Regions:
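Secondary-structure boundary/linker elements at domain or insertion junctions
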Residues: 1-29, 78-105, 109
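Short, cationic Gly/His-enriched loop motifs
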Residues: 32-105
């Protein structure tokens, strides 16, 4: 393995501010096939794979709090509505309510 290659299992904080974990070492793969956001990896280990249009958010807004109870899956569209309408807070219960409102918005405004 070249000296500048990270081994599988390496964790890095990338420019987006999130922790990414190297999950594979395929030399011809796209970058996203070798790396996965840690919160998504944890969610998928507990609940199974998520579709590509779903991301995992931190209910308390702290992107270093990987407690499974602090993680929630949302679709890209739900995430957009949450950000547009300020439905993300540092209070996990309010963020859960925001997710539900965003889901209603997505389902009724399509």
């Amino acid at each position: 393995m070249p000296a500048n290659t990270d081994p599988v299992g390496t964790e890095k904080v990338l420019a987006d501010g999130y922790v990414w974990v190297k999950i594979a070492d395929h030399s011809k793969a796209k970058k996203n096939d070798n790396w996965k956001q840690k919160q998504r990896l944890i969610w998928e280990q507990l609940h199974g794979p998520l579709p590509d249009n779903v991301k995992v958010i931190f209910l308390d807004g702290n992107n270093r709090n990987f407690d499974p109870d602090n993680l929630a899956p949302v679709t890209n569209r739900e995430h957009l509505e949450m950000n547009r309408n300020g439905f993300r807070t540092s209070d996990p219960e309010l963020t859960k309510a925001g997710i539900n409102v965003a889901r209603l918005m997505v389902r009724t405004w399509l």
